[in-house]
Structures are given as C-alpha cells and as structure tokens.
C-alpha cells in the first residue's frame, strides 16, 4: 500500500540525492534540502504519528550518513544561501529558494551551458507509459503541501484529507487529478517560477481556462478562439492560459503543434529567398503538406494544427476578425508606413508543457503582452527574421557601409520607437523594455522578501537592446527550476505516431543502412569532386576583423568552383607556399605601412625566401585609408615579394579605401579575380556558375529609380548635419582668425577662435578633437550646377525620392530636403576623386564615343585608374570637364556623390582657460596637381575656415581622444613633440597647466617641448606664447628644429631628439615613468618612433627586439601617446 506520510514529513527532496545530481549554482551535491512547509510542522506530525514514525528533518547541524563512502571522498554540502549582488548600487540579496530546486538544468560539465537555447534540463520528451505510482506520489504530496502552504491560515484537516484522497486515487487509477483551484494555483505558480520571463510581476493576475473536459481537436479550436478573444480584449490585453487534458500514458497526448497561437507564415521560394517570416518556413511547409492553401504574403497568419487524445492532427484557420494586428508607423518618419509592416497584438506561447506535482499538461497555450523589443529588435531586425535593419538605415540616410558609424544602433532605436508608437496609437497594450526591466527589479526584490529567492535567467532577462543602461544588466541572478514549471517539448510532428499513414507529411524516410550507404557515397563523390577541383588557399591579416570578414566572403565565392580553404596568416606554414595552386591574400595595413600583428610572421618568412621552384598564381587585396600616405602598403609589399619569387599575378592588386566604397571595390575585384581564375584553370560550366547574391548586385545607374520633387520646407543645417553624421553638432561662431605665419611666408597657418551662442556651452578636454563640417568652395559649386542638365531654380528646396520594389515613391533620407546649392556646398563631397564604380555609372551618361572608351579603360584597369587619379587628383567638376559629353542630372549627383565628411582638428585651447570657446590651429592647404603644372586645388575645410566672414556659423562637435590626454598624475614629466601644426594639442596642454598653476595652485611635472618648422622668421608659430610659458614655469625647456635655414643643414625633430635629448628622454621614460607625446603627420611619427627605438638600444643596452618590446610596453602603459594624421596632400602633388 502506498503511504503519503513518509513523504509529507521528509525534507523537500524525497529520495537521497546521488553524486550525479548537482546543485546548479555550486556544482556540489544537494545534501541539504529546506522544508518548505514550516508553520506548525509539529502539529501535523502529532496528528499522524500513530500511523508512522516520522523521519528526522535534515538540518545543517546534522551529520550525513556514511553510506559506505569514505569521509575524504565526500563533497562538502552546499551553503544555506547564495549571495547575489547588484553591481549598480552595491546591494545584495540572499537566495535560499534555490535549495528547493528540482532539476539540474545545465552546467554539470566543465563548460558553462547557460547560454544554450534549450538545455536538456528544460526539455520534456514524450513518454512510453504512465508515470509509476511510486514516482508520482511523492511529487503529488509535495505539490499538495505547496498548495496548502499558500493559504494565510493553516487548513490542516483539509490538507490531510486531500493527501488521503490523492493517495487513494493514485493507488486505484495510477494517477490523480487536480481540483480547479489547484489547477489555477499551479498555473500561476508556473508563471511565477519561469526564470526566462521578465514580466512576472503580473503572475497573480493570470486568467486560467480549464479545458480538461475537451475531447476533440474541434473543441480545442473553439477553446483557443475563446482564449484569443478574451485575451485580446480589443487591444487591452489580458494574460490567460487554457489547459487541456493531462498526459496519461504518452500515447493520448493533447498537443498544439504551433509554437505560438498566432504567427506569420514563411514561404521558401525556388531561388532560396523567403517571403514572410523565415522562422516559420518549416512549419509553413508542414501546413501546406497537411492541406493548407498558401497565400504567399509577407504577413499571412498560419493555421492552427491541433492534436487531441493522441489522434492525427487537424488543421484550422482562424476567423480573420479575432486576430488583432497593428500596422507600423513612425512618429517622425513618414516613409516608415511605406515599409508596409504590421504585427499581431497577442503573443501566445503554444507548445510548452506544464508540469505540476508529477502531472504533465502537454497542451497549455498561454499569453501575456508584448515588450516592444520582442517585435522591434528580434522579429523585425534579427538577420534570420524579417531583417529590415539595413533598409531602415538606408532610408534614414545612415552610413550603413561603415560599422563605426553605429548605423545599426541608430536604426534599431527608431524601429523600436515605431513599434511602441504604433501599438500606443492603436491603444494596444505594450511595454517598453526600460519599464519592463524596472518592474522586474521590483518583482525580484519582492520575491526575495516573500520567498527567499527568485529564479532568473540573466541571458533572457536582459533585453536585446540597451544592455547596461537597464537595471537588470547589473543584477546577479540565480537560475534554477522550481515546480510547477513550464518545460519545452520536442516538436510534435517529429514524434507523432500517425494513425492514417496517407496523411503523414512526406518525410522521405530512408532505412538507416541505406542512409549510411548514401551518406558514404555522397561523401566519396564530394571528396572526388573537390579533389578534382583546383585548390585555392585564402589567407588574411587583420587588426579589426574587417579583412577576415572579406576573406570569408572571398572563400565563399571561390568555393563555387574551387576547392578552397581559409587561414589567418599566423596559421599559414610558409613551407606550403610552393605547393599552392592559387593563393589569395586579403590584408589591411597597420600604422606606418606595417603589417597587422597576425601578419608579421608571414612577412618575415617571405623576406627569407629567394625563389619558388614552382610557378604558383596569386592575387592580393589590400584594405586601408587614403588619409595615410602608406595606403595599402603591406598589400603592395606582399604583391611585390610574391612577384619577385616568381609567382604569377592573377589580377592587379585591389585596394579598398575605408573612406570611399571599400566593400564595393572588394566585390568588383573579387568577381574579376574569380572570373579570371575560372578562365585560367578552365573550369567546366564557368558561364553558368551561380555566384553568391552579394556579388550579383547591379552597379549600373538606373534613372527611373530616382526622381526630384519640389518641397516647401527649408533646411536646418545643424539638425541635418547632426542626423547625417550621428553627432551632437553645435553651431558655433567664428570669433577671431589670425595668420600665425610671417607675411613673407608663402604658406598660411591660422589660429581660429570659435565661440558659443549665449545659451550654449561646449565641454572638452585638452588633447581632444573637434570635428568641423565645412562648406565646399562657391566657385566649385556654381561650376558644377552649371553642368547639371536639369538643375532646379537656385532657391528651390528639392527632395530626392526613390522608387521601391513595390512601385511606390519614398523619400531618400541620405540627404534632407534642401536646395541643390546647399547639398553641394555642405552635404556632398565634390572634391574627392571619383571611384571606379562612380566612373562606371558615369560612362552610361556620356554620348561621345571617345569619352566612353576612356571611361571604360578607367573603370576596368586599376593600374590606369590609379595613374589617372594620383596624377590629376580631379574633383567631380574637373571630371565632367574632362568628359564633356557626360549629361548628369540632379538625381545622379544626389545619389552617387559620397557624403562630405567632417574634418578633425586637435583642440588648441583649455576649456577652463577660455570657457565657451574653442581654439584651433589650422594649416591652410593649397597645391597644384600634375607635378605642379595642374590646376590649383584647395583643402576643403582649411580654405573654408580661412575665407568665411567673422560671426559666420561653423558647425562642429567634440570627439573624444582618450589616448591623448595629460597624465592622470600631474607630477609626471612630459615630452611634447610636434612639428608644424602638430603643436596644436600642446597649446591646450600648456594652457591647462597654466590655469592649474595660477587658479588652483597645482604645479605640474616638467614639460619639455620639441617643436619643428622651416625657418625661425617664417613659420615659427606660437613663438612668443611658448617663450611666455617658459618664463612662467609651465614649460621647463623648449627645443626647435629648423629644416630650411639658408646655409644650414636640414634639422628635424628626430635629429634633436637623438642628438640633444637622448639621455634626458631615456631618464624620463625609464626612470621617472614619464610620458612622451607625438603629434603630426604619419611620416614624422614613424621617424620619431624609429629614433626612439635606436636610443633605447644605445642607452639601455637593449637588443632591437628588446627595444621593440619596451616600446610596446610604453604604449600599453599609455605613456607613449600618438595623435597622427594622414598626409595633407599626396606625393604626386606639389604644395605651394
């Protein structure tokens, strides 16, 4: 006979825990269990002691039975509580509730499994028979105890009577049934115990619908329809659960096959694309195979597939009127409606299992209401879902080709704004993720007060956006399983035993033996096919990961026809070089033309090789920035070395400019390399190879996709620039401008002072950068407008619109509504030489055959293009003058010209010394192209700052430069090296030190300035101010290098560094742990670094390797600071 009392008065754990069951928090045995039925235990014991002898309750003071295990082998018992801390406010909570945890959900191995989607401990599989009574009874007793413990007043008699009833029912039938009140209690507790739910603060308000009398799938459907209508409530969403009959023997289960009651279909098309929700593709196929007629829309609600009493499933379509959907719109962006998005109002999970006291309810759909990010981030933005992020970013005019622009973050915020706005406008319940996080913190604190714990899965609780600015991010959490509980289940269609085999979806079942043979055969055929293909090795070197991304893309492309593998350069064995058939190299250039760190080994190994015994083929693509003179230098060095070794170049070196269409350039180069390789290696069927989608986009200009419409609004330049660049642009005024060079000098360096409006403030630190958004020269703008065939009136505001795939016109958000003159002056880059991609599109607009032929050569020959570009350095107006038959439209310029990027300058003032002002030191750039014989070109920003009138607006913003700040310890000595305008940030340094000395009484450490210029009477800028700083004790010593004194040898800063400051520099850096700052162009910085390394070799008796390591340590310790800018003008042009 079954006896409940042996379980009723034991601790919470019924059976002795073996070493296999570990506590999920401490990974030790659960030797201690807390008795959850605390109040009046003695009374209940006295009532039952006639029937049985009560087993002692285990406490932490009692000794464990030996059980034949040596004491030395015992695992220490887990603590009575675990402390969870809040990193934000320093508070802590003590969790004891976890001691009653039921399951081991993960982390029983050495590898943490906390981020797995469905750990084994959270999944319940099917059963082959009923739960044995001996297993069921203790779980039933435990649940009954939990239920009666929930009452404020004890109901001992009712509790005992219920225990006897349950015991008899299990004894006679093998199972038992919950009362309706117990079912309601269980459902609410299961929600309360759900560790992955952030919205549990509403757990006690759950509406429970008891559908245990249901017999058929049709009745299930009727219950679910009533559930949806109740829960939707015209948008005022109410949480509810419908519970169908419990599992009996595992062969008569009730199941809802859908993962959610409402979900959109996903249709896999023949070309591999998906219409609708990609997450629903598999289930949608199942619906179609079961007889549902697809509609092939983006937002088709899939039907319900319901299984009653273990029978084959039936399919039901919802009446349209019971599904509430919310069309998406944005409070600011009108074009958001044009995306034609919507979402259903009711989130209802349908495929989980409710476990209560050993009973399993396999069909129990339940709902809450949406948190905005569930739709706005996961459903709309996940790559594997609707994936609208890039489209939204494009419409917002964001730089989606540059991750550092944070375009994804800006776009996802606006998408979530749209979701919240749309639901609120339709009066449909939704909660933003910040409010949800706040409510969870309140719930968690209350649960610790009431229950002594709160199971929570941090990975799921923290919302998918905003991270550490939500309070839950900073809260430690314990994750454990209590009972009652909602478990995951294996998809029903994967386990269902069909009664009518004719209705079974076609699974194309194959016997295991046949399948094994087929797999083996396919494997052998694949190996044979791959072995027959020419081998290609792709190697890459990277600092930021961009080269690796492109190398993987290249590998995918070549895998269409070649046997490819990919390696990082530091994994590549140089001895394999002669074994290669085709070697593809993708690499960035680091610093002053050096290799990335993971390319140095290969670089050194290549230098040791003399000649290859086999003629391999190769191709190289380089990434870099044309701001620097050593653009793609490492890529060219590899190309040159491989050529010297006798390797054959497949295609010319490709170059990807970070500032101008890098990915476009890579795709063009990659396709060219692939097609050339297919020709050389005579690949069969090369003309019918299906390339990856990324390589098949059309680069041609289609004028029918764009149009210009007139607009009445005027552009707010500051707001427009803020939106375009994602910066807090401040409209400052030009207060003062002074030429710092002598009037006898042919060059100009200006001190620019900008001031705030009276109602504004600006904050910055010495050494930080100021971004200036300049204007292009009026002469250039007017000349360009004169070449536009459909230029609108000068003062007419225009708006660019693009035709979408659906055929409607949408405003293009790359640039706002403005006049053409404003766009060409402030928003678009008209001075940078056009890319090959732009020239290719321009070739469509020329009418003269000669122009067309020349443009075709420039488009397809990288060598010719580079010669042309570096010799002419043409702006877009000069290009149109070179190809006079080109007829460009307003839409062409607005869509094809790149955005005008801000120019950055080191701040030359102290915010404390000159509040509400920004001072800049600017070299005005003028140069002639074509070896000095070409047209006169001007630096965009420097010329603009030198020509605008006083009090004219200068849009600017502050950019942090964390690596170029004064020492945190003011007493540390500093060496400042800055020739020319490299002195700019050091002026902010000495002004700050002077302010600290005179206003705060803080005496800074020794500061030595090493300046360089051409001639003492020409361009020795800030000479008097520097002398004053020396007199006041702010600067201890000042050294100046003059490179153009008549009759004197050229002296540069690195010469003085080595000849006059060798001992001093080594003492400051090595003994006094001081700081060294270098500001200037990249060549000077490289020379200073090399000089310093030679000094270290000499003064510290270091080897070259040790000097390199010491130099690296200085940088790591943030005691060697560089503020380096690219060459102001390239080698091929001559400055005047």
Curated annotation (Swiss-Prot):
Cofactor note (record): Binds 1 FAD.
GO cellular component, one term: plasma membrane
Class of the enzyme per the UniProt entry, highest EC level: oxidoreductase
GO biological process: arginine catabolic process; defense response to bacterium; inflammatory response; negative regulation of blood pressure; nitric oxide biosynthetic process; nitric oxide mediated signal transduction; peptidyl-cysteine S-nitrosylation; positive regulation of interleukin-6 production
UniProt binding sites for heme b: 197, 488
Record EC number: 1.14.13.39
Positions that bind (6R)-L-erythro-5,6,7,8-tetrahydrobiopterin: 378, 459-460, 473
A Pfam family this chain is assigned to: NO_synthase
Subunit architecture: Homodimer.
Record-linked PANTHER family: NITRIC OXIDE SYNTHASE, NITRIC OXIDE SYNTHASE OXYGENASE
Function noted in UniProt: Produces nitric oxide (NO) which is a messenger molecule with diverse functions throughout the body. NO may serve as both a paracrine and autocrine signal for modulating osteoclast bone resorption. Also has nitrosylase activity and mediates cysteine S-nitrosylation of cytoplasmic target proteins such COX2.
The protein, known as: Nitric oxide synthase, inducible
């Amino acid at each position: 006979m079954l006896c409940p009392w042996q379980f009723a008065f034991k601790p919470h754990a019924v059976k002795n825990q073996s070493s296999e069951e570990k506590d999920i928090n401490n990974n030790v045995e659960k030797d201690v269990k807390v008795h959850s039925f605390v109040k009046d235990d003695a009374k209940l014991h006295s009532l039952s002691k006639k029937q049985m002898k009560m087993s002692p309750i285990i406490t932490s003071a009692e000794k464990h039975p030996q059980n034949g295990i040596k004491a030395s082998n015992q695992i220490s018992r887990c603590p009575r509580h675990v402390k969870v801390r809040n990193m934000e406010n320093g508070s802590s909570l003590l969790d004891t509730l976890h001691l009653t945890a039921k399951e081991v959900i993960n982390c029983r191995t050495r590898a943490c499994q906390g981020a797995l989607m469905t750990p084994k401990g959270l999944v319940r599989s099917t059963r082959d028979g009923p739960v044995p009574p001996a297993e069921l009874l203790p779980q039933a007793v435990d649940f009954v105890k939990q239920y009666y413990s929930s009452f404020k007043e004890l109901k001992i008699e009712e509790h005992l009577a219920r225990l006897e009833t349950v015991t008899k029912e299990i004894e006679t039938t093998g199972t038992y049934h919950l009362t309706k009140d117990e079912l309601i209690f269980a459902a609410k507790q299961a929600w309360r115990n759900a560790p992955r739910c952030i919205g549990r603060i509403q757990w006690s308000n759950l509406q429970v619908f008891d559908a245990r009398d249901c017999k058929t799938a049709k009745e299930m459907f009727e219950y679910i329809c009533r559930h949806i209508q109740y829960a939707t409530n015209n948008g005022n969403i109410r949480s509810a659960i419908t519970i169908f009959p419990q599992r009996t023997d595992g062969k008569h289960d009730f199941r809802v096959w859908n993962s959610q009651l409402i979900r959109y279909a996903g249709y896999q098309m023949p070309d591999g694309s998906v219409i609708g929700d990609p997450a629903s593709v598999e289930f949608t196929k199942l619906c179609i195979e079961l007889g549902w007629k697809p509609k092939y829309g983006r937002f088709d609600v899939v039907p319900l597939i319901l299984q009653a009493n273990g029978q084959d499933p039936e399919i039901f379509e919802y009446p349209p009127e019971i599904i509430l959907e919310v069309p998406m719109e944005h409070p600011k962006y009108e074009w958001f409606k044009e995306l034609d998005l919507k979402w259903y109002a009711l989130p209802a999970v349908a495929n989980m299992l409710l476990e209560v006291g050993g009973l399993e309810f396999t069909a129990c759909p339940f709902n809450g209401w949406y948190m905005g990010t569930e739709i706005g981030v996961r459903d709309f933005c996940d790559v594997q879902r609707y994936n609208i992020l890039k489209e939204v970013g494009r419409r917002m005019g964001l730089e989606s080709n540059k991750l550092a622009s944070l375009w994804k973050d800006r776009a996802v915020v606006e998408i979530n704004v749209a979701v919240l706005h749309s639901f609120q406008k339709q009066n449909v319940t939704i909660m933003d993720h910040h409010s949800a996080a706040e409510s969870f913190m309140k719930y968690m604190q209350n649960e610790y007060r009431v229950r002594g714990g709160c199971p929570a899965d941090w990975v799921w609780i923290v919302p998918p956006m905003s991270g550490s600015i939500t309070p839950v991010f900073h809260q430690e959490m314990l994750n454990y399983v209590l009972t009652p509980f909602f478990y995951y289940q294996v998809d029903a269609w994967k386990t269902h035993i069909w009664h009518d085999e004719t209705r079974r979806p076609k699974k194309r079942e194959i016997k295991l033996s046949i399948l094994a043979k087929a797999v083996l055969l396919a494997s052998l055929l694949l190996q044979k096919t791959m072995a027959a293909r020419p081998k290609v090795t792709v190697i890459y070197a990277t600092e930021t990961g961009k080269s690796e991304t492109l190398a993987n893309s290249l590998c995918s492309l070549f895998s269409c026809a070649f046997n490819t593998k990919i390696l990082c350069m530091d994994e590549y064995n140089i001895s394999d070089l002669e074994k290669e058939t085709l070697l593809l190299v993708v690499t960035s250039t680091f610093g002053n033309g050096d290799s990335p760190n993971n390319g140095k080994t290969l670089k050194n190994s290549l230098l040791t090789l003399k000649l290859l015994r086999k003629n391999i083929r190769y191709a190289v693509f380089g990434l870099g920035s044309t701001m620097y003179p050593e653009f793609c230098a490492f890529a060219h060095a590899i190309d040159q070395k491989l050529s010297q070794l006798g390797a054959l170049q497949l295609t010319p070196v490709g170059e990807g400019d970070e500032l101008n269409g890098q990915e476009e350039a890579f795709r063009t180069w990659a396709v060219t390399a692939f097609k050339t390789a297919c020709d050389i290696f005579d690949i069969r069927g090369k003309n019918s190879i299906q390339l990856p989608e990324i390589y098949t986009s059309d680069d041609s200009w289609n004028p029918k996709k764009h149009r210009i419409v007139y607009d009445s609004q005027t552009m707010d330049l500051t707001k427009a620039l803020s939106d375009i660049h994602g910066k807090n642009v401040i409209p400052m005024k030009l207060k003062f401008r002074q030429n710092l060079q002598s009037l006898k000098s042919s060059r100009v360096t200006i001190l620019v002072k900008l001031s705030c409006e009276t109602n504004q403030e600006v904050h910055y630190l010495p050494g930080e950068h100021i971004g200036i958004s300049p204007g292009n020269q009026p002469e250039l703008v007017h000349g360009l407008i004169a070449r536009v065939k459909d230029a609108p009136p000068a003062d007419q505001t225009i708006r660019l619109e693009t035709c979408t795939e659906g055929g409607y016109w949408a405003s293009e958000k790359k640039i706002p509504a403005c006049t053409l003159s404003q766009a060409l002056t402030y928003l678009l880059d008209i001075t940078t030489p056009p890319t090959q991609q732009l020239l290719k599109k321009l070739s469509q607009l020329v009418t003269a055959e000669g122009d067309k032929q020349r443009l075709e050569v420039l488009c397809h020959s990288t060598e010719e293009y580079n010669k042309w570009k570096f010799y002419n350095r043409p702006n877009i107006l000069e290009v149109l003058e070179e190809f006079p038959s080109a007829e460009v439209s307003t839409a062409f310029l607005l869509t094809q010209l790149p955005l005008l990027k801000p120019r950055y300058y080191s701040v030359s003032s102290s915010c404390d010394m000159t509040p509400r002002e920004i001072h800049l030191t600017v070299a005005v750039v003028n140069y002639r192209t074509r070896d000095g014989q070409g047209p006169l070109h001007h630096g965009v920003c420097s010329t603009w700052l030198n020509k605008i009138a006083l009090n004219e607006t200068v849009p600017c913003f502050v950019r942090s430069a964390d690596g170029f700040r004064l020492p945190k310890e003011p007493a540390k000595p500093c060496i400042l090296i800055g020739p020319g305008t490299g002195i700019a940030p050091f002026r902010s340094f000495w002004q700050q030190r002077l302010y600290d000395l005179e206003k705060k009484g803080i005496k800074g450490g020794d500061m030595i300035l090493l300046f360089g210029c051409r001639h003492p009477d020409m361009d020795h800028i800030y000479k008097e101010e520097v002398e004053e700083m020396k007199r006041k004790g702010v600067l201890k010593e000042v050294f100046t290098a003059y490179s153009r004194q008549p009759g004197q040898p050229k002296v540069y800063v690195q010469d003085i560094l080595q000849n006059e400051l060798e001992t001093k520099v080594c003492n400051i850096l090595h003994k006094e742990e001081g700081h060294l700052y270098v500001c200037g162009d990249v060549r000077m910085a490289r020379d200073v670094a090399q000089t310093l390394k030679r000094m270290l070799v000499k003064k510290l008796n270091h080897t070259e390797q040790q000097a390199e390591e010491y130099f690296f340590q200085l940088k790591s310790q943030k005691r060697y600071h560089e503020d380096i800018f690219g060459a102001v003008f390239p080698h091929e042009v001559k400055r005047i």
